[in-house]
Amino acid sequence: MRLLWLLATVVALTSAGILKDAPKKRYENFRVYKLTIQNEFQLAVIEKIAELSEKYNIWKDYDEHTKQLDIMVSPEELKHFQNLIMFNNIGSELMIENVQERIDEEQVTATADDATFGWTKYYELEEIEAWLDQIVDAYPTVTEKFIVGESYEGRTIQGIKISHKTGNPGIFIESNIHAREWITSASATWFINQLLTSQDAEVRNLAESYDWHIVPVFNVDGFVHSHEKDRMWRKTRQPHATNACIGADANRNFNSHWLENNGASSNPCSETFAGDTPESEPEAKALAEYLTTNKEKFNVYISFHSYGQYLLSPYGHTKEEFPENYADILTIGKAFADAIEGLPYGTVYQYGSTADVLYVASGSSVDWVFNELDKKIGYTIEYRDKGRYGFILPPVQIIPNCEELMVGMRALIEKTKELGYL
């Protein structure tokens, strides 16, 4: 009982802000390895050490097709980790030698050009929200802000609607549900800007033929924490009464096959913790309520993530079943991937159901929209790269990534319309 009381006290103090003055977490000499897993025992060994110790962090879950996963290792555990993988005959490739160096490189030095919002650096929440205000002021006849709801820490979850005419079919984009995936909100704001300012005929047609509902930063609390305290933070920020670990994976917290088939974790310290109950996180509950209320306003749902270069579709909770319209879903996915691969960058995207192409993930927003709101076209876009930088994608890659997004989205929407879903 005393242990439970102490844990609850720590959580309460943290929630009250007493412990929030802790210094920003540094990742000096933390390494990221890509491991090649040959059997279930090896996988269990790696997943167990990651779940039991905060000195390990799985960046990219096990992919059954490549037989690989990415894991970050603290310098204190490095020798033990190297012995462990050698003893268990697990293949490894060093992807990042010093995570903190990558983080430091990501922080672009301010220049005179930074007086205006752009896409050569990553921005904090207040800067993104201020830019949204400027956009609405600059384009009052075709834009309006909307509020999805409120986060645990009391921040508003803001979005922008772009609409050129009444009666357009709608597309909803949710971004940065995982806090550390900064490329997602950067891509969302770039996409908004292009819809409003581009003079390209195909982009103008895309902008004016559909209503766009875009939430650049969904996990607002986690996003702020990732900027101010811990660059590698993923989850929400709601504490738990009986555990010192904070937050849940909001993308495992939706009430669609919640916690099924090991597609999430019941451990509050896990990065894929599903929450205490479905929609236990205020953010997930708010989005579910908002989308339910406004379900007639959109036909397609897209969720921005990183990393790995995938276009993932339902189902996430099982690879034994597929949606009735899976052939159409794959046709659209191929159009997206082919369009991106046709660019000079040569970036390759895999496409298919989450569970089949990548891993089982239950309780995701895309699956919830598909199953509960009957929206039959929904995708998770996992942006660059394949692991060389992972979540810490250099700012110089923001615009190339966004260019891939635009050609991919144009192809995706065109094929979706051709097949009769828009």
Where are these regions (language model features)?
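M14 metallocarboxypeptidase catalytic domain recognition
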Residues: 2-7, 12-422
